[in-house]
Amino acid sequence: MLSLKSRGSWNVLRWIQVPRRTAVIPAKPSPMRRKRRRIKNVSSKDLDLRGIDPQDSRALEFKVKQLQEFTRNLKEQFKLADSNTKKLEAEEELAKSIPEDDDKRADELFGKLEAPAFEKPLPQPNLSTLILSAENQQLKKLIPVEIKERINDDGFLLARLIDKDNQNWNDIISKLYTTEKRLSDISMPIISSGILRKVKNLSYENIEKLDIMLLETKNGDITCFNRLMYETLLLNLSNLRPPTSGEEDKVTMKMRQLLERYDKSKEISPDVPSKMTQFSLNCCLKYSTKSVSFENMEYFLSKFKNDYGITPNRENYTTVIQFYVKFGVSKQAWDVFDTMKFLSSSHAPDVTTYNSVLHLCNRERDYAKAIDLYEEMLDRQLQPSIQTLNIMAKTMARASADNVISEGKADSLRLLGWKYIHTLESTFDHTKHETHFYHTLEAMMALAAYDGDVGFARALYYKYTTRKYKEVVKYWKGKFDSQKIWQTALDPQLFNLLLLAYANFRPNKLPILLGYEKGIKLRRNILNSVDYAGRYDLDDEIKVQLPMLPISDMNQAWQILAESRALWQFNLEFGGYYDLRDTPEGFDTTRLQEMVSKSATQDELQFNILHQVSQWKFQLVNHSILNPKSLTTFLTIPIKNGDRIEFMLRLKEFTFQQNDLESRIEKLYKGLKLVESRVEPNSHERDLAINQIEMDENVKWFASMKHKIVAKNYIYELMMKAASAFKDSAISKDAWQSRGEYRKTKLFQQMDSKRRIESDTQFAALMVQFFARQNMLTDALAIVMSTRKFIDWKYHMVKGLHEGLVKLEDEKSISILLDIVNKKSSIELLDEKIRDFQL
């Protein structure tokens, strides 16, 4: 959680401690320091105490030292005497056993007796020997000796295994595969403990090599392929990334191949115990979830249940639910969840399972269901996790956005969301759970954004972004790359929530947090902990500043518009690294003419231009920020704050019409091709001069596409909302005509028919709403009547029109409208006839 202390004692979530350093400075040598006296050559006469004053401590101390020195000398003399005695005894014994005339042999013996006094010490191992010995001991723990001998490269093995968190088994398996014997003649216990239980993160190619080597150990007998072998291969397969669209899914094919191998082994030896386990099933389900393959999920579930008698356990069921949630199949997810609750206690949902279905509630904005599940967890004595509380807070925030879904209780839902945040704050220590910090921050920003609490949302965004930037810079390695650093620090999800807070800002609305004591304290501490001017960061080595107004809170619409525009540019430009208005380097009229000349057809020219624009977007614009979701929120800000001019400027600068692109390319292509075909030189020069202005304009227009998004249905719907808000018929007319042109393009025609009908329905409803607000009731009713065969009109879509007709007491029009709204489908009419017939 965020720290709630005041500015003076506030600390960031991650502590950066600088240890104190001490220095020891030796004292300056003093000329007055008395030198220590060394006592030498002490005799027995020196030990005489006569003439010594008993009160003189220095004299007595000196005599004690003389006595110690005399005693030490005596000990050395005794040792020397003992040594000489031993030498004499050895000499006499040698003289008795060896002839006296063998002087040479005697000298050698006496030399050996003398040798111990001058013998050199035993040779000590050098540093290289110690390192090699340590490496051998370490390798014995990391890999079996038999496999080490096969590879025969200790340095290679140690370099790839010494870091237990990042072991490189791919290189080891590849090198082992190139050896002569591979895994042959190595006992199964050694292979199991040294390879199968340790190998991880293998590539697909190395999984195939490992499979071949394991089969070789069994001489190709698939009946001897044991359980651990299957589990190891399936586990490494499940950790691989699914292929991109259009590529062959080799991983799923390999998984199915392993199951088919096991089926064949069962046919050969039906009495062998089952080698398929819950673990194997979970590996298959894990990969199916990542690949988002409904077909594979159903195949593995039915295969393990029908052929192997393995029904999913709690972990398997949770994986299946997570898959259904990710796939968007809510009904199946709820069915599996309900099934788990009615099975044995070992299958009962745990906190992870509840979190999975809570994600579904958040997506569907079903706050009532989420609250019921949370209370159910408490009744079953399951401790909600940090993730649980974060999801609950987000669900309350999202549900409060729609007045219909929230049933008019938007403020109550946000207040309940803050309750979950306070529970999280009091229950968990954020320093021990910092990995969940981002999700908690996201939940808090969501609550503030939907409440329109700009001050709190921008403070959280500033704190997170500046902290993230400093962390990235601090641990950055290699050449400093400002673009990549800012791309990492600028989070698109949090930025969209900040834009949403700007859009929902109302100067006369009191934030929810200011309605109770805990909220007041939290909001005050967060706002006071932020210094937008950077005055308190002067001593910080890493400087960072965001283009935000140096005020803690906002109360004017112009402040919202100015800051949102500045932050939008800042995010798109990688923190100001590029300028959006600059033309990309190397792109001018000559380059554009060259592209036209090299294009054989108009479609080829369009493809080449769009390809160039996509490269610019990737290189020069922060494309993670420039997306339809953020753009919609960005365009909504001036609508909610009542600034028509700003809305039109933003719309023109960051969107383009598909038909404008096609018509411009067509004119450019035909115009230049026509000029190239001219024969008369004077006419040719005149046409080039005339087209130079158009070419310059085309260069600017195509260059600006790098920071623009093509206008689709959501843009036209937003234009209609703006027309209603500003009561501007010109905007509505422009939206109507532009969308009409858009419906003729391939982009719209290639859409699914269901989506086309949905978009037409939504746009028509907005048109009716606009005309009703403008009191153009006849035009609104005409739209409803002309589209009744294609659009299923509901009352909430024509509510404004109906209320306007009621005020005018136009009974005929009201009757026509209600007949259209209350009309029944052919299926409903058929059901009524069947019921009448039964009666």
Curated annotation (Swiss-Prot):
Keywords: Mitochondrion, mRNA processing, mRNA splicing, Repeat, Transit peptide. Residues 1-59 form a transit peptide. The keyword Ribonucleoprotein does not apply. InterPro entries: Pentatricopeptide_rpt, TPR-like_helical_dom_sf. It holds the Pfam family PPR. PPR repeats lie at residues 313-347, 350-384. GO terms for biological process: mRNA processing; RNA splicing. One of its GO terms (cellular component) is mitochondrion. The keyword Membrane does not apply. It is found in: Mitochondrion. Involved in mitochondrial-nuclear incompatibility, a major determinant in reproductive isolation between species, through hybrid incompatibility of Ccm1 and its interacting partner 15S rRNA between yeast species. Regulates mitochondrial small subunit maturation by controlling 15S rRNA 5'-end processing. Localizes to the 5' precursor of the 15S rRNA in a position that is subsequently occupied by mS47 in the mature yeast mtSSU. Uses structure and sequence-specific RNA recognition, binding to a single-stranded region of the precursor and specifically recognizing bases -6 to -1. The exchange of Ccm1 for mS47 is coupled to the irreversible removal of precursor rRNA that is accompanied by conformational changes of the mitoribosomal proteins uS5m and mS26. Binds to mitochondrial small subunit 15S rRNA. Belongs to the CCM1 family. This is Mitochondrial 15S rRNA processing factor CCM1. It comes from Zygosaccharomyces rouxii (strain ATCC 2623 / CBS 732 / NBRC 1130 / NCYC 568 / NRRL Y-229).
